[in-house]
């Protein structure tokens, strides 16, 4: 079973990406360094629910 999760920028707080994650692997939230269109640079994005 998959669950939808959004990725929010830690700098500006905008939600830029969505992921389909396995509901089994739910230990901790995902943190990925991705490009933020609002900030205009690569920043850390954390999972939101």
From Swiss-Prot:
Pfam families, sorted: Ribosomal_L33
Cross-referenced NCBIfam families: PRK00504.1, rpmG_bact
Organism, as annotated: Lactococcus lactis subsp. cremoris (strain MG1363)
UniProt family annotation: Belongs to the bacterial ribosomal protein bL33 family.
Taxonomy, superkingdom: Bacteria
Protein name, entry field: Large ribosomal subunit protein bL33C
A cellular component term, taken from the record's GO annotations: ribonucleoprotein complex
Keywords of this entry: Ribonucleoprotein, Ribosomal protein
Entry's Gene Ontology BP terms: translation
GO MF entries: structural constituent of ribosome
């Amino acid at each position: 079973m998959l669950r939808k999760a959004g990725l929010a920028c830690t700098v500006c707080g905008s939600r830029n990406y969505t992921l389909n994650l396995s509901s089994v692997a739910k230990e901790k939230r995902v943190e990925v360094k991705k490009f933020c269109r609002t900030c205009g640079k690569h920043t850390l994005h954390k999972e939101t629910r």
